[in-house]
Amino acid sequence: MEGALAANWSAEAANASAAPPGAEGNRTAGPPRRNEALARVEVAVLCLILLLALSGNACVLLALRTTRQKHSRLFFFMKHLSIADLVVAVFQVLPQLLWDITFRFYGPDLLCRLVKYLQVVGMFASTYLLLLMSLDRCLAICQPLRSLRRRTDRLAVLATWLGCLVASAPQVHIFSLREVADGVFDCWAVFIQPWGPKAYITWITLAVYIVPVIVLAACYGLISFKIWQNLRLKTAAAAAAEAPEGAAAGDGGRVALARVSSVKLISKAKIRTVKMTFIIVLAFIVCWTPFFFVQMWSVWDANAPKEASAFIIVMLLASLNSCCNPWIYMLFTGHLFHELVQRFLCCSASYLKGRRLGETSASKKSNSSSFVLSHRSSSQRSCSQPSTA
């Protein structure tokens, strides 16, 4: 049921098209059918994901635009991660939703290749911008004096977007509009070698999931160690401050006290941002693990239940990661959304006040005009009456 997959590449289509292009073994005589009940579930799930991703990330971008702290490095990375999640919603979830509604891809070959290319761009961008944000937090905690400057941040984000555009290029060559049955065309993958689907999906799994997760684990391992070390220093500083003066009178006591006081302790704000990025990473792992597990299973096991409902629905849930991130931002940076709500309420109040003033002014003009007209008409009537003398 190739049209029901929410993946950026169709595992079933890949398996079906493993033979050389033009081979007749991949075509069927009659028109393929699908489970309409399952298709309705897929459409409902994708509609919900699309609505949540669009509304949530649009609110994040609007909140970041209206906040007073526009030059925060964390907010800079949040902005680009929200843009990447919007790319996932618009160019991955929306095309798949339309595809599930129509069952077949209706469009030219160029559109087929473009859609499949943009679907993977969103995946790569969302993953590697999250990785870049985590590296930034790691540098901010472990080496605050060497943390990236604003210009370097922009260059790193630009390089990440360009790298994602390049890494997604194989999609253009793999997918094309081809005949899958007599007179039936669809946007399917074509692999020249039988091992092509295994190699390609394994590479995507390594590039988008396994390698980033390893790097993220290393980053947060270093961050955890640094925070633990910092807590020890805070405890030592508190103990040194409470100790009697005579206890630190010796040279060793003075050296230890100087060492503790010279260490720059990590602020609570930095720890809060680390918690936020850690939860985002955890959501990334939870959302993507079932998807890649199912993808690898589908190409490495010939007996995988590719038509099972649970198997297909799991593939749809990968895009949930783009829905989760805005709620995580709201949890840890609630002031952003509070400012957005306040701005919205102020604008609404100003609009309603202006509208009431406009209506009042129009009403006064109307009353004044009616008074003048009635006064004139009464004057004319009094002048036109004949004299009784």
Swiss-Prot record:
Q: Known PROSITE patterns for this protein? A: G_PROTEIN_RECEP_F1_1, G_PROTEIN_RECEP_F1_2
What GO cellular component entries does it have? plasma membrane
Span-the-membrane segments of this chain are 39-63, 75-97, 114-135, 155-175, 203-225, 276-294, 310-332
CDD domains noted in UniProt: 7tmA_OT_R (cd15387)
Cystines in this chain: 112-187
Phosphoserine found at: 366, 368
Cytoplasmic side of membrane? 64-74, 136-154, 226-275, 333-389
What topology in the membrane does the UniProt record assign? Multi-pass membrane protein
- Which residue ranges are recorded for the region named Disordered? 7-31, 361-389
Q: What biological process terms from GO does the record include?
A: cell surface receptor signaling pathway; cellular response to hormone stimulus; female pregnancy; G protein-coupled receptor signaling pathway; lactation; maternal process involved in parturition; muscle contraction; positive regulation of blood pressure
Which InterPro entries does the UniProt entry name for this protein? GPCR_Rhodpsn, GPCR_Rhodpsn_7TM, Oxytocn_rcpt, Vasoprsn_rcpt
The organism sits in which domain of life?
Eukaryota
List the GO molecular function terms: oxytocin receptor activity; vasopressin receptor activity
User: Where, per UniProt, does this protein localize?
Assistant: Cell membrane
The record's comment on protein family reads:
Belongs to the G-protein coupled receptor 1 family. Vasopressin/oxytocin receptor subfamily.
The identity of this protein, by name, is Oxytocin receptor
Organism of origin is Homo sapiens
